[in-house]
Amino acid sequence: MLLSAIIIFTSLPLSVFANEGLPYGNDSIISKEIKKVYSDIVLIGGETVKFSAGNVYSFHAFSGEEGYYAVKITYRCSRENSGRPTLSVSVNGETPFSEAQSIQLMQRFENAAELTDEVVRSGRVPEQNEVYEKQTAYLSDTAHFYGSVLFFPFKQGDNEIEFKMEAESIEVSELLLCGGDQTPDYDTLNSSYKYKEYGGEPIYIEAETAKYKSDASLYAVNDSTSAATSPTSAYKKYLNTIGGSSWKNAGQYLEWEIEVPEDALYSVSFRYRQSVNAGMTSYRKMTIDGSEICTELNEMGFKYASRFENYTPYSGNKPILLELSKGKHIIRLEVVIGKLSSVLPEIEEIVSKLNSCYRKIIMITGSNPDSLRDYQLETAVPEVLETLEALRKQLKNIGGYIENVMEGGSAGTKTIGTLTAQLERFSKDAYTITGELSRFKTNITSLSTWMISAKSQPLLLDYMCLSGPNGKIKNAGASLGQSVAFQLSSFIYTFSKDYQVNTKAQGGNTVTVWTSSGQTQLSILRQMIEDDFYNDHNFTVDLKLVTTSLLMAIAAGKGPDMALNVATTDAMNYAYRNAVVDLAEFSDFSEIKTRFRASALTSVSYKDSVYALPFTQSFHMLFYRSDIISELGIKIPETWQDVINALATLKKNNLEFGIPIPSDLNTFYSMLYQNGGRLYNEKSTAAELASYESISAFTQWSEFFTDYQSPKQFDAQNRFRTGEMPIVISDISLYCTLNVLAPEIQGLWGMSLIPGTVKADGTVDHTGSATETCSVMLKNSNKNECWDFLK
């Protein structure tokens, strides 16, 4: 066992580790019998060291024997951070497993104002502020597939461990190598209890009053589906619950500060609803005052419930009791993957391998093969058939496990069963593959979609209750009389309810603002107006959600003072008809326009006049599958000629290059500008599409569809995921879509600027075109107030 440790701290320059590492669960990395070393090695203690973004921090530690260590860290997030701190870890110069490349540390937030009864009844969500307090945690994989702790391999003797801050900065006050916490089961814990059982009245803690949370998105929300929700109203939207779809990702937590009246043993219950993932169970881990309690509370399962139900954790046929001393305590509920954590990484790997097999098949057959032709796949790609058979056996075992732990299965077992049966047909007769290729692709996508939903652990909480084991707690459902009265009152109220998301009256003039944004965005905008804008302005903003035509309202003389989220083409149409205000006439416009890129104002300008301010902007990027283009020997295209060069290799392997469909002219505009052309003349009085540059750009653009047969219609997300289209130009929103909906290709794709055109001086022009919406001010008598709001 370890007798001593040698600790050396150094700060190294930014570097990239060459060894990416295998997955954590790989048998060659972590054996099923992990030998953990339990003597602590202190790397940082008694001092505070700032880990700055971009730096690498190296420590040397002497281990008396070979074994595995967990890393325990006490840290404080830096105030200059804009997101979660992320670090990577290497041991003895190597990344031991791929999960060590990106390890996130949680932030901490609280309500800016206390959630009093008045705030609850107002329906106005308090602003969320980050709390810069010390937190203690074990380094764990970002997806939390492997529980709360990652164990790193150390050899006997001297070891070097390096921490590289990939993003943001933290202040570290303690850093330990240790064996992790040893959590007892409930029977062991119960035998050590000394307090008596609580015999008083049940203690209710409103869930929406959570003191701390891991994300700013975890705030109190309204639920008006039940008369038994506490508190509730048939007429107003009380902030009476917390969680739901915003509390679903592994690692997210909520903390409540509770106070108990005496030293005693308490049973804990929750009123909850989980109506998002049908047939699935959402899991939570409970800790008290920062410590795990027992193994049973590390995976509390909240089953699917379309209506509110009560949940009390049990051990056998008895409720689990918590030994709490008199006074205040912190109860934390953290999202965990639960019983599926052991198979989801395996499914993710299977999806990746199935996509690879599918891609290798279409390299032979094409994506639309002739079902009557025998492509001799047994000879062409025998290794693919062997892989498919191995994956079939894996899926069959996983399906049985899921059916067992989910007590009868779920949508996942049906999806796995369908895919397993198909793979069995492929194994018996490879000739059937071409006829079922489209369904094979669909089944892979279905498995990936289910995997994403299985990772999601949504849970809505109304309240928590502490009572004695025999205490009588409130029913989760309302009585028939309560339900009828509540629903009847709600129905009657609909005849007089104002469905607009208006701000409170402020006094002074009233400015009417229309927007076509969603209800959530509208509520956020309303809150920003009331919390910030009203502090410095003495007039009322009447905010309305309107999806009808603004043009008809203007023509009828019923239009608003301002409109948000308007298409730039519509804004200029109103400008030509003298219906909107030229913003350039305001004295401080020259200062305001510096907030935006000059190009963002081009589409709403004419000569020296500017008729709107940008509201949203979207543009194209180049997305590429790094694994596939590396395999094919294709470099990331920097120019359009690079794309053409890559097309020969892609076509030879029956793969595609995706360029936005002809109805999306942004790619053509990009080529036009890169070739030195423009849409209009200098005075913007005539189009210049007949110029040499314009015709050259149009020819270049159209040849991708005529000469190179790029598909005119395609699903960029799915074809990129499967690898059919390893290079695609798409809207920037695809970045977020892939991060959320394509976990199986995480780390296997990248994003770059759209291809450019080489200039005479050798530089590459990557000029692109953007799609925008804007905010306009209609001609009215409240110009100054409207300008104050708009800017």
Task: Label the predicted regions.
Residues 9-20:
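Sec-dependent signal peptide cleavage junction
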Residues 487-507, 568-621, 642-644, 746-755, ...:
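Hinge/lid segment of periplasmic solute-binding proteins
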Residues 506-519, 533, 539-544, 562, ...:
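Short, well-ordered beta-strand elements
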Residues 575-578, 597-636, 655, 661-685, ...:
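Periplasmic solute-binding protein
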Residues 684-713:
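Glycine-centered hinge/linker elements that transmit conformational signals in sensory
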